[in-house]
């Protein structure tokens, strides 16, 4: 869902290039060693961070890791940035960028976890290539993930979940976890689950939350 444009968010993003990259040039290498205090820590990225509840919570809970939130909308990115600055979340960097270029922004084999949370389902067939679990996006995740890295995906959209199961399977990925109702799963994955804004809203209405974890076979 596109948020209404907030001029303050654009201004805030422009004022803090040290912690948020705004539409970076895909052809220009990003020096992540300079942007993080210790880039040798395990790295997780969330593609489509929305207002940032998931990525900011996770970063605060895991100071032993680094996190990158990728969000295309400037207003949403500004909201995440505001939280990061107010709560002094030092192990979080942000990008206001198109996920289609993600493999050009990050070094090969540098990421431990890719999070896809409540992505736009793009239900029309002609928009299939825009889905974040389409094969061309899987190509990019494979490039940036470490050999032992994995992908975690959550959605309330049954159609997108079924599509993603087929897409990942056809790509040759192996599933480590699949749930058709995460919030009623009595397991470790639910116990450590961090909710997004959308997830909290959908789950409160009684909607099932679909979840999968998968890895590439090298």
Curated annotation (Swiss-Prot):
Protein's UniProt keywords contain tRNA processing: yes
EC number(s) given by UniProt: 2.1.1.33
Keywords of the record: Methyltransferase, S-adenosyl-L-methionine, Transferase, tRNA processing
Binding site for S-adenosyl-L-methionine: 46, 71, 98, 120
SUPFAM superfamilies, A to Z: S-adenosyl-L-methionine-dependent methyltransferases
Any one of the GO CC terms: tRNA methyltransferase complex
Tree of life domain: Bacteria
Catalytic activity: guanosine(46) in tRNA + S-adenosyl-L-methionine = N(7)-methylguanosine(46) in tRNA + S-adenosyl-L-homocysteine
UniProt enzyme class: transferase
Active site, renumbered: 120
UniProt cross-references to InterPro entries, sorted A to Z: SAM-dependent_MTases_sf (IPR029063), tRNA_(Gua-N-7)_MeTrfase_Trmb (IPR003358), tRNA_methyltr_TrmB_bact (IPR055361)
Gene Ontology MF terms: tRNA (guanine(46)-N7)-methyltransferase activity
Pathway(s) the chain acts in: tRNA modification; N(7)-methylguanine-tRNA biosynthesis
Pfam families linked to this entry: Methyltransf_4
Residue segments, region Interaction with RNA: 126-131
Residue sites binding substrate per the record: 124, 156, 196-199
NCBIfam families in the cross-refs: PRK00121.2-2, tRNA (guanosine(46)-N7)-methyltransferase TrmB
Family to which the UniProt record says this protein belongs: Belongs to the class I-like SAM-binding methyltransferase superfamily. TrmB family.
Its biological purpose: Catalyzes the formation of N(7)-methylguanine at position 46 (m7G46) in tRNA.
Name the UniProt record assigns to this protein: tRNA (guanine-N(7)-)-methyltransferase
Organism encoding this protein: Lactobacillus johnsonii (strain CNCM I-12250 / La1 / NCC 533)
